[in-house]
Amino acid sequence: MRLIAENLGGERGGEAVFSGVGFALDQGQALVVTGPNGSGKSTLLRIIAGLLPKAEGRLLLENGGDDFPSIASACHYLGHQNAMKTALSVVENLRFWRDFNGRGDSGVEEALDTVGLGGVGHLPFGYLSTGQRRRAAIAKLLVSHRPLWLLDEPTAGLDKASEARFAGLMAGHCAGGGMIVAATHLPLGIEGAELRMGVAG
């Protein structure tokens, strides 16, 4: 499987944010997108996820097979918002995302244990602290089983121990043949190529 971007351009509010972006990402690889605020990091991820239209260029997924015929079917996007219902329990939220992504055999409790939230699955999501909410959102990645993780500032709200745990999860995902595109202004603790946005020329 290979994700390819050629001469991509993005807009926000009708104004060009970036242009000429290109990269190729193979299974087992990560791409870390850096740059100042307003340089288009989030816009790029949303374009890859299919949440925003691209202004120009080409974006395609090669060799996804029958399981992943498109980028949308292959990716799970973790944005600034955790995309969890505050009134539902943590387990109910994760079951929704597991079923929505067609992976009904995934272990929700196991995912919670992996992110250090074992024992809180029965609580309403709204009861959790900021860091716990982010870890619960990270657990969505584990129950969705999508090969392409699109991560926008994924460690926001995490303490150092949780950051280290997540770095291990990302490394494990890539070691298993997964791919990651992560936008960040903080070190993520993973090996990968860097794409710096907002650089003249």
From Swiss-Prot:
Query: Which keywords label this protein?
Result: ATP-binding, Cell inner membrane, Cell membrane, Cytochrome c-type biogenesis, Membrane, Nucleotide-binding, Translocase, Transport
Enzyme class comes to translocase
Q: Which GO terms describe its cellular component?
A: plasma membrane
Where is it localised?
Answer: Cell inner membrane
The intrachain disulfides are: none
Q: What is its EC number?
A: 7.6.2.5
Q: So where does ATP get bound?
A: G35, P36, N37, G38, S39, G40, K41, S42
Q: Which domain of life is it from?
A: Bacteria
A GO biological process this protein is involved in? cytochrome complex assembly
Mainly localized where?
membrane
ABC transporter domain residues are 3-200
The keyword Chloroplast is assigned to this record:
no
Q: Which reaction does it catalyse?
A: heme b(in) + ATP + H2O = heme b(out) + ADP + phosphate + H(+)
Q: Which SUPFAM superfamilies match?
A: P-loop containing nucleoside triphosphate hydrolases
By its UniProt entry, which PROSITE patterns does this protein fall under?
Answer: ABC_TRANSPORTER_2, CCMA
Instruction: State if Transport is listed as a keyword.
Output: yes
Record-linked Gene3D superfamilies: P-loop containing nucleotide triphosphate hydrolases
> How does the record say this protein sits in the membrane?
Peripheral membrane protein
SMART domains tied to this protein: AAA
- What Pfam families is this protein classified in? ABC_tran
Q: What does this protein do?
A: Part of the ABC transporter complex CcmAB involved in the biogenesis of c-type cytochromes; once thought to export heme, this seems not to be the case, but its exact role is uncertain. Responsible for energy coupling to the transport system.
* Family as reported in the entry's similarity comment: Belongs to the ABC transporter superfamily. CcmA exporter (TC 3.A.1.107) family.
Q: Under what name is this protein listed?
A: Cytochrome c biogenesis ATP-binding export protein CcmA
- Please report the organism this UniProt entry assigns to the protein: Mesorhizobium japonicum (strain LMG 29417 / CECT 9101 / MAFF 303099) (Mesorhizobium loti (strain MAFF 303099))
Q: Which gene encodes it?
A: ccmA
